[in-house]
Amino acid sequence: TDYERLNRRNKTIELAMPFGNAQPFISTGFIPPEMFIGRTAELAKIRDMNGPTLVYGGRQLGKSILLKQVSLLEHHPEKDMYAFYFDIKGKDMEAALHAIAGELSRNGLIMTEPETWEDFGEQMKDLLTGRFQKKVSKLMLLIDEADQFLLSADREKNKPIEVLRDIRNYSENRFKFVLAGLHNVIRFDKNRLGSNTVYGQLEHINIKPFSFSDACELLLKPLSYMGFEIPSMEIISTILSKTNYFPGLIQFYGKKLVESVKESYRKKDFNTANNPPYVLDEKYLKTLLEDKDFLEDIEKKFQITLRVDEGDDDYYYLIALAMADCYALEDGQPKQNYKPDDIRNVAVVYGISRLTNLSLENLEALMDEMEELNIFRKDEEGGYLFNRYSFYSMMGGTEKIERELENYADE
């Protein structure tokens, strides 16, 4: 049977891999399907034609990979099924329309590129109802990095979103669009999903760091195929905690680990006469956790997440600095969770009007956004802390925190 043939092939690969040369971990760029590990629930929801339309979360959490995987699994032109992935970073609604229509035109789904979103809507309805010669049983538009697009659409009363929604409603589950991004996707979700607008009709999904089980699988499964074993659950937990359960950072650590093992083999530090599994020494693994490039990459990813709202007065970064100042006043050991008025008090002390001019309600909304981005965690009483203690450490020492806050003080 096909299953038996596939099983034999997998077993053959599993037996041969420990004696070969491979690098399964890829920290940037395209991730091959066999390295798509975890996110099964999120993947199923996005593939569902009635599933979520808004996808948001911090950087390095795998939103783009999710959308690309959906495109890979759902794109079957031979079956009249199409799933297109678009990266529209920095594009406004006009540029996004040009990119989307251009791809559909190149694939023979539309004959002429529309000049407006309204024209695009009419063309899609004609396509999906069979008025063109091209038959389409399913069409998915997976639109990534949609933040600028959403800002642009907001200035036009969200007309492009209404057009996409109308196509979906018209098509009887044969059309779906997905908008993925960071800051603006979150803000639209918070402000409008519950209101009587187009966003009130759109479901959403928040992509968070990996669960422990998914993170373990991403780290250990490729290593096991290569014949390596990490014997201690304690060191596994230490590694995953250091990566903050970010898939991209787990891939980065795995890549560094494989490169280091290859170098050790070259130096004959491993006894090649032994048979797999080859047990990786705990000291060896912990040394890699202090690798300069690895630590720099962790901090870089954290800072990128904080700076997603650079066009919006650096609110996230400022709030994180104020939170770090609260920690520093307790010698890095907070005795309580902090509320918006605690953050405002720090801003008052340093004379930062960008924060003091905000109402407590708006400040809390921003802190909720930071919780959605996994920077903060919130307790039942409405208090906040850094989601991981390492986030506080990445803000720098007390002197750096104070200096940065002073830089934002009003002149």
Range-by-range predicted roles:
Residues 8-58, 65-73:
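Walker A/P-loop-proximal flanking segment of P-loop NTPase domains
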Residues 31, 35-38, 232-233, 245, ...:
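Winged-helix-like regulatory helical subdomains adjacent to P-loop NTPase cores
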Residues 80-113, 126:
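Conserved NTP-binding/hydrolysis module of P-loop NTPases
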Residues 206-235, 253:
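Conserved small helical "lid"/interfacial subdomain of P-loop NTPases
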Residues 354-373:
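Short amphipathic alpha-helical interaction segments
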Residues 390-411:
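Short, amphipathic alpha-helical interaction segments positioned at domain boundaries
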